[in-house]
Structures are given as C-alpha cells and as structure tokens.
Amino acid sequence: MKGISSLERLRESLRPLRAQVVQHKVYGAIETLEDLRIFMEHHVFAVWDFMSLLKALQRDLTCVEIPWVPQGHRLSRRLINEIVLEEESDEETGGGYISHFELYRAAMEQCGADISRVDSFLEALRRGNDMD
C-alpha cells in the first residue's frame, strides 16, 4: 500500500484551521435561501481568486513553458499539481470532470443566485480587459 500523499499530510495539518473557517459566524448568518444567494454572489469571486492564486503558484513552482524542463523542488511540484488536478478537474457526480469554480457557479444557478456579474467578469477577462 502506498504511503500518505503530501496533499493528505497538508490536509491533515490544516484540519484545525479548516474547522475554524467552517465554524465562522458568517455561515450562521445564512438562514434563508435569499441569504445564501447573496452570499454566493459575492463568495464566487473568492472561489475564482483561489483558483487564480493556485495557478500562479503552479506557474512559479513548476514548468508550464514549452519546451518543458524540470524546475523547482520535486515535492513542491507534486503538491501543487495534485491540488490543481483536484481543483481544476474534480470528478463530477454521474461521471465527467469539473472545476470547483464551475461546480460553485452551477450551484449558484441551481439556487437562483445571480450569475451575471461573475459571468461578465469572466467574459471581460477572456477579452483581455485589465481588471485594475
């Protein structure tokens, strides 16, 4: 049997901090579907930002250029690529793969949250607009 992965070790070390986040008072303030919609309409940008930070780390810690050459610390490369794999292409219920961001956006649609702002933001990025 294979040993515990670096990602699993990281998750275990972060378990107490994750518990603090999950128990944050903001979640207790979400009492209605409308509360959830409003929360998600803002929180979706944090989900997007996390993915952007993750991809920046991947770019800085690994080689994403052509031609490829080994770059960075081996364990760091493995850890960041494991996280990217899970965040960018997690297994979807019923088969297939989906990013956590896309999953969150789909949940927003399902609960009736307004996705127009995040969709406009993404479209502006696709067109190359600077967000500064």
Where are these regions (language model features)?
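Non-heme di-metal
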Residues: 2-132
